[in-house]
A protein has these predicted regions:
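Short beta-strand-to-loop junctions in surface cap/lid or active-site-entrance loops
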Residues: 1-8
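Serine-dependent carboxylesterase/thioesterase catalytic core
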Residues: 9-22, 26, 30-147, 168, ...
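C-terminal catalytic-base region of ester-bond hydrolases, centering on the histidine
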Residues: 147-224
Length: 224
């Protein structure tokens, strides 16, 4: 194995509901330009349960990043992908995991998902991961392991599903309310004027992701 492959820090990108791993293509390229090794984890967001997908992510980390590689591992998850990450972190995660960035993840609840789940035929469309998550007691707490830092990035541009699902609290990103993203125990959080899906193509988001992966904090000014 080459020396650079042993020392390179890895970022694993985890997509959200109804989307393939390819939706993180831009962020993948941007992170590679910063010197990271980038992997995109794909999973059945509709067919698989949250528990199954979290276990699959844990196995993916173990298989794709050999135990002999000591370099830090970072995770970035969009929406449901963030919930998969949080669920995986509850089960003795790899000690090399250092930082996590959650993009538009409904950490504590989801008004849109609960409203849709109550409509005929919608539970099957939302999928088993979302339904399992909704069945749990609301409220998620960040892992307590001291070496783990989690950053929460939320959007405030209300464009999307929220316009047809009544009652979504403001501010929101069109799908997830800002208040729903607030993860107790997170190292830092930031709100940007982007919509839910826009996070996947936003250079502003990319810059904040990179800053958090490097420092464990976002940059809270106008210079990003």
């Amino acid at each position: 194995m080459r020396e650079e492959s042993i020392s390179t820090e890895t970022v694993i990108l985890v997509h959200g509901l109804w989307t393939p791993a390819a939706v993180f293509a831009l962020h993948g390229r941007w992170l590679q330009r910063r010197g990271y090794r980038v992997l995109r984890f794909g999973y059945p967001s509709v067919r698989g349960t949250l528990s199954q997908n979290a276990l699959a992510l844990k196995r993916y980390v173990a298989v794709r990043i050999a135990p002999g590689i000591a370099a830090p591992i970072y995770l970035v998850g969009h929406s449901l992908g963030g919930l998969v990450i949080l669920d995986m972190l509850r089960h003795e995660p790899d000690p090399r995991l250092r930082r996590v960035v959650l993009l538009g993840t409904p950490c504590v609840d989801s008004h849109c998902a609960r409203r849709l789940a109550g409509m005929a035929g919608m539970p099957a469309l939302l999928g088993r991961s979302i339904i399992e998550w909704l069945s749990r007691v609301p409220g998620v707490v960040a892992p307590s392991r001291a070496a783990m830092e989690i950053g929460v990035l939320a959007g405030t541009r209300s464009v999307g599903l929220g316009r047809v699902v009544p009652g979504l609290p403001r501010p929101n990103d069109g799908v997830v309310a800002l208040a729903e993203t607030r993860l107790p125990g997170a190292a830092d959080c930031i709100a940007l004027p982007v919509a839910h899906s826009e996070m996947l193509v936003s250079r502003h988001c990319a810059a904040q992701i990179a800053i958090f992966l490097q420092t464990g904090r976002f940059q809270h000014d106008e210079q990003v």
